[in-house]
C-alpha cells in the first residue's frame, strides 16, 4: 500500500508549487548517480532498504543492470519531509557515459536543479564539466554530492586531514567551473559553500552522507566515521542511522534548489524566445495552473503495452486526459488519452497534472523529444521552445541486416521505434546497396542499440565493423555553373563557397535557425558574421548539417512555383556529396539566376532535382573539396610516471596534446584525437599504464583530413559503398 498512499499524497502536494522541486542527478560515468538515486528511492519506501545501493532500480533495462551504466533517463516522484513539511521531489536520473549525452542534455530542459555527483577518488572529470556546463547554460542550479568517500578511507587509507584536502580541491574545481560557465547574475550567487550545506559528502553504496550543518547539529565528527569503518561491515547500519544519506541530500535539495515558480521566472527567458508579455509568456513566467496549457516534451518511450509515452514538463496550465492539444513542431492536433506520473518504471494514473510538474502522457504518438505542446486554441500564438543543443554528434555507423531475411519488416519496425526513443540514433537506408545504416555517438551507443534489438524484439542482426562518419566540405569559392534539367528546358546558375566559422557556430548553437524571423536572422548574420545585406536577407534554407541556400536572383519568372522543389533538391545534394557520398557540411550554395519552363509538366522534381545537384556537385569539385573527420577531446588522469607512455600513444594516433596539468602525484592530460584512431585506444591506455589510467572523452569538432591521407581515404570509402574508386570530375556533371 505504500506506493498507493504515496501516489495520493504526492498528487495532493503537487498543487502547491512551494513544496515541489524538479531535479536531475548528473555525473561522469560510474561516479555513482544511479546508486545515489536508489538510496533515495529506498528512503521513499519504493524499493526495499536491503537492496538499495545494489538494486539500481532506475536502471530498469536489463542492459543497464548488466553493464552498471545508465542508458536512458529515468523519472521518479519522491515524497520527502523537511522540518515537518511534506515535499515532492521529481527526480530524473541521467546517463553519464558520453555516448548517451543527448539524453542528459534533454533532461536539463525540464529541471531546475542538478545534484552533481563527483567521485572522491577520481575528482572532476570531462563529463562532470560537460554536464555542469550544460546545466548552467539552461540556468539549472547545481548542488554537489562528493561520493565514494568510503574508498578514501578503505582503499587509499587517507588521514582525515588528507581527506579534507581532497574535498577542498574538488569543491574549488566545481566552483571554478560555475564561475566560468554560469550566466553573469549567477556566477557568484551559485558558488557552493560547504558551511551553508550546499555540499554533501558520503557513500551512495554504503548509504550514509552528511552536510556540514547536519554534522554540527548531530555532533558527527569525521574521525567517528573512520572509526566505524575500522569495525568492518557490521558497523554500517550504525553509520546509516547516524548519517542517513537521503536526509543529507534531499534536505540540501529542498533548501537550495528553487521551486518551479521561482525557477521559471529566470529560466524561461533563456529557453523560450517568445514574447514574455503575451498571455502565454505571462502564464509561463507565473507558472499559472489556470493559464493556457504549455508542455515541453523532453523524452519519448515506447511502452510494449501502451504505445508511445511522452514525458515532459508542464510550464503553464493544467494537463488533463481527454483534451485536444496542438503539437507545434509536428503541426498537428492530438488527443491526450491518459495522464500519469512516474514512479521509476511504473506509471501511476492521475486525473490532472498542474503547471510546474513533470508528467507522462499517452496519446501524443507524433510527439518527439523537444516538442512544444500547447492548448489547441493557442496554436497560432505559440512560439516553440528553443531547439535543444546536443553535446555530441553521431560519428560512428554500422551497416546491419537481419540474420533471417524474413525478419526484415520486423527490423524496419524496431529501428523506427528505436529512433523515436533516441533521436541521437540516426537510421538511414543506403538506396544503392539496400543496407540499413545505424549511426550513433560512439561504439558503445551502437552496441547497446544492437543488444536492444536482440532482447526487446528478438532480432538477430549481422552488423558490420563500425565505420567512421565523415563530412564533405570545400576550401575555396567556385565560379557560377549552369545546371540543366534532363529535358534541357530549365537552367539554374549556381555557385558554392565555404561558410565562415562564425556562421557555422551561430547555426550549431541554435542562434540562427531556418524557421526564425528573416529580418532578425539577417541582422544577426550582418552584425556577428559580416554577411553582405543582400545575402543575409535572402536565405531560403538551412539544413541539419549546417549548409545554407541563398537566392540572389531578380525577376525570374515561375521561380516561386519551383522554390520548394529547388530547396528539396539542395537538401538531397547535401545529404550525399560528390566526393564520397558522405553528408556535406559548412557550404553556402548561391542561386544567381534561373530559366524556368512555363509549363508545370516540364518543371517537376524529376527535372529540377538533377539541375540543382549537378551545378552544386560541379561547383564543389572545383572548390578544393575535402573530407572532415570527427575529433574527440580526451581527458586522461594517470600517475605521473606514465606520462611519457600516454603521450607516445596519443601522438602515434595523430593526436595532439593540448594541456598537461600536475595534480599531486597525478598527471592530467587534455588531448584531441581523431575518432578513427580510438577503436583500440582503451586497451592501449590500459596496457601502457598498468590499468591505472582513468579517462573520459567527448566530441570536440570536425577537422579536415590531412591532405596526405585524403585521396586514399576517399577511394576506400567509395569502394566500401560499391562505387568506382576514383572520385568524379566536374565535367561528369556539367557539359564543359
Curated annotation (Swiss-Prot):
Superkingdom assignment: Archaea
A GO CC term assigned to this protein in UniProt: cytosol
SUPFAM superfamilies: EF-G C-terminal domain-like, P-loop containing nucleoside triphosphate hydrolases, Ribosomal protein S5 domain 2-like, Translation proteins
Main location: cytoplasm
tr-type G domain boundaries: 18-261
Keyword line: Cytoplasm, Elongation factor, GTP-binding, Nucleotide-binding, Protein biosynthesis
Subcellular location(s) of the protein: Cytoplasm
Cysteines engaged in disulfide bonds, as pairs: none
Residues with the Diphthamide modification: 602
InterPro entries the UniProt entry points to: EFG_II (IPR041095), EFG_III/V (IPR035647), EFG_V-like (IPR000640), EFTu-like_2 (IPR004161), G_TR_CS (IPR031157), P-loop_NTPase (IPR027417), Ribosomal_Su5_D2-typ_SF (IPR020568), Ribsml_uS5_D2-typ_fold_subgr (IPR014721)
Ribosomal protein listed as a keyword: no
Binding site for GTP: 27-34, 93-97, 147-150
The keyword DNA repair is annotated on this UniProt entry: no
Any one GO molecular function term: GTP binding
CDD domains (UniProt xref): aeEF2_snRNP_like_IV (cd01681), EF2 (cd01885), EF2_II (cd16268), EF2_snRNP_III (cd16261), Elongation_Factor_C (cd01514)
Family in the record: Belongs to the TRAFAC class translation factor GTPase superfamily. Classic translation factor GTPase family. EF-G/EF-2 subfamily.
HAMAP family on file: EF_G_EF_2_A (MF_00054_A)
Function of the protein: Catalyzes the GTP-dependent ribosomal translocation step during translation elongation. During this step, the ribosome changes from the pre-translocational (PRE) to the post-translocational (POST) state as the newly formed A-site-bound peptidyl-tRNA and P-site-bound deacylated tRNA move to the P and E sites, respectively. Catalyzes the coordinated movement of the two tRNA molecules, the mRNA and conformational changes in the ribosome.
Protein name: Elongation factor 2
Encoding gene per record: fusA
Amino acid at each position: 500500500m505504500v506506493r498507493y498512499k504515496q501516489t495520493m499524497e504526492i498528487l495532493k502536494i503537487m498543487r502547491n508549487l512551494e513544496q515541489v522541486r524538479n531535479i536531475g542527478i548528473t555525473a561522469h560515468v560510474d561516479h555513482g548517480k544511479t546508486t545515489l538515486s536508489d538510496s533515495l528511492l529506498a528512503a521513499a519506501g519504493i524499493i526495499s532498504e536491503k537492496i538499495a545501493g545494489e538494486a539500481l532500480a532506475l536502471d530498469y533495462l536489463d542492459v543497464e543492470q548488466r553493464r552498471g551504466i545508465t542508458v536512458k533517463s529515468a523519472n521518479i516522484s519522491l515524497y520527502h519531509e523537511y522540518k515537518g513539511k511534506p515535499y515532492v521531489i521529481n527526480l530524473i536520473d541521467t546517463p553519464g557515459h558520453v555516448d548517451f549525452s543527448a539524453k542528459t542534455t534533454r533532461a536539463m530542459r525540464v529541471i531546475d536543479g542538478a545534484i552533481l555527483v563527483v567521485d572522491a577518488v577520481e575528482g572532476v572529470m570531462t563529463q562532470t564539466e560537460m554536464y555542469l556546463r550544460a546545466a548552467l547554460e539552461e540556468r539549472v542550479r547545481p548542488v554537489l554530492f562528493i561520493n565514494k568517500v568510503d574508498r578514501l578511507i578503505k582503499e587509499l587509507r587517507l588521514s582525515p586531514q588528507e581527506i579534507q584536502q581532497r574535498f577542498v580541491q574538488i569543491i574549488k574545481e566545481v566552483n571554478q567551473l560555475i564561475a566560468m560557465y554560469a550566466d553573469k547574475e549567477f556566477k557568484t550567487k551559485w558558488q557552493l559553500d560547504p558551511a551553508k550545506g550546499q555540499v554533501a559528502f558520503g557513500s551512495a553504496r554504503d548509504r550514509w552522507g552528511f552536510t556540514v550543518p547536519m554534522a554540527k547539529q548531530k555532533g558527527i565528527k569525521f574521525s567517528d566515521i573512520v572509526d566505524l569503518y575500522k569495525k568492518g561491515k557490521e558497523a554500517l547500519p550504525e553509520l546509516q542511522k547516524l548519517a542517513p544519506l537521503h536526509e543529507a541530500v534531499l534536505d540540501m535539495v529542498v533548501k537550495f534548489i528553487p521551486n518551479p515558480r521561482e525557477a521559471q521566472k529566470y529560466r524561461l527567458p533563456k529557453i523560450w524566445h517568445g514574447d514574455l508579455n503575451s498571455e502565454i509568456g505571462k502564464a509561463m513566467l507565473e507558472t499559472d495552473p489556470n493559464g493556457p496549457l504549455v508542455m515541453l516534451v523532453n523524452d519519448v518511450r515506447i511502452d510494449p503495452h501502451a504505445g508511445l509515452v511522452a514525458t515532459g514538463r508542464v510550464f503553464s496550465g493544467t494537463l488533463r486526459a481527454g483534451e485536444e492539444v496542438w503539437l507545434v513542431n509536428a503541426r498537428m492536433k492530438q488527443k491526450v488519452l491518459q495522464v500519469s506520473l512516474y514512479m521509476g518504471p511504473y506509471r501511476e494514473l492521475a486525473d490532472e497534472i498542474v503547471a510546474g510538474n513533470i508528467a507522462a502522457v499517452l496519446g501524443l504518438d507524433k510527439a518527439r523529444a523537444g516538442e512544444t505542446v500547447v492548448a489547441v486554441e493557442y496554436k497560432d500564438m505559440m512560439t516553440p521552445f528553443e531547439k535543444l543543443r546536443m553535446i555530441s554528434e553521431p560519428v560512428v555507423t554500422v551497416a546491419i541486416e537481419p540474420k533471417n531475411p524474413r525478419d526484415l519488416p520486423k527490423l524496419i519496425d524496431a529501428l523506427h521505434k528505436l529512433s523515436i526513443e533516441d533521436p541521437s540514433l540516426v537510421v538511414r537506408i543506403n538506396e544503392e546497396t539496400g543496407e540499413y545504416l545505424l549511426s550513433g555517438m560512439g561504439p558503445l551507443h551502437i552496441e547497446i542499440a544492437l543488444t536492444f534489438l536482440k532482447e526487446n524484439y528478438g532480432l538477430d542482426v549481422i552488423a558490420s565493423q563500425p565505420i567512421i562518419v565523415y563530412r564533405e566540405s570545400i576550401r575555396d569559392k567556385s565560379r557560377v555553373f549552369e545546371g540543366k534539367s534532363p529535358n534541357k528546358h530549365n537552367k539554374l546558375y549556381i555557385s558554392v563557397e565555404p561558410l565562415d566559422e562564425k556562421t557555422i557556430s551561430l547555426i550549431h548553437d541554435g542562434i540562427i535557425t531556418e524557421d526564425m524571423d528573416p529580418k532578425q536572422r539577417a541582422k544577426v548574420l550582418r552584425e556577428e558574421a559580416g554577411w553582405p545585406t543582400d545575402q543575409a536577407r535572402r536565405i531560403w534554407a538551412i539544413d541539419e548539417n549546417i549548409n545554407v541556400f541563398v537566392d540572389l536572383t531578380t525577376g525570374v519568372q515561375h521561380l516561386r512555383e519551383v522554390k520548394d522543389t529547388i530547396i528539396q533538391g539542395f537538401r538531397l545534394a547535401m545529404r550525399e556529396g560528390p566526393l564520397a557520398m558522405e553528408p556535406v557540411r559548412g557550404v553556402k550554395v548561391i542561386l544567381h539566376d534561373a530559366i524556368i519552363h512555363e509549363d508545370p509538366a516540364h518543371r517537376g522534381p524529376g527535372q529540377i532535382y538533377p539541375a540543382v545537384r549537378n551545378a552544386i556537385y560541379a561547383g564543389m569539385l572545383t572548390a578544393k573539396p575535402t573530407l572532415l573527420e570527427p575529433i574527440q577531446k580526451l581527458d586522461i588522469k594517470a600517475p605521473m610516471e606514465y606520462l611519457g607512455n600516454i603521450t607516445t600513444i596519443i601522438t602515434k594516433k595523430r593526436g595532439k596534446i593540448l594541456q598537461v596539468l600536475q595534480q599531486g602525484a597525478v598527471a592530467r592530460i587534455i588531448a584531441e584525437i581523431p575518432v578513427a584512431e580510438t577503436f583500440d585506444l582503451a586497451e592501449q591506455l590500459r596496457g601502457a599504464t598498468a590499468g591505472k589510467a582513468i579517462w573520459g572523452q567527448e566530441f570536440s569538432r570536425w577537422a579536415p583530413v590531412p591532405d596526405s591521407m585524403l585521396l586514399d581515404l576517399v577511394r576506400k570509402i567509395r569502394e566500401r559503398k560499391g562505387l568506382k574508386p576514383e572520385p568524379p570530375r566536374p565535367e561528369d556533371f556539367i557539359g564543359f
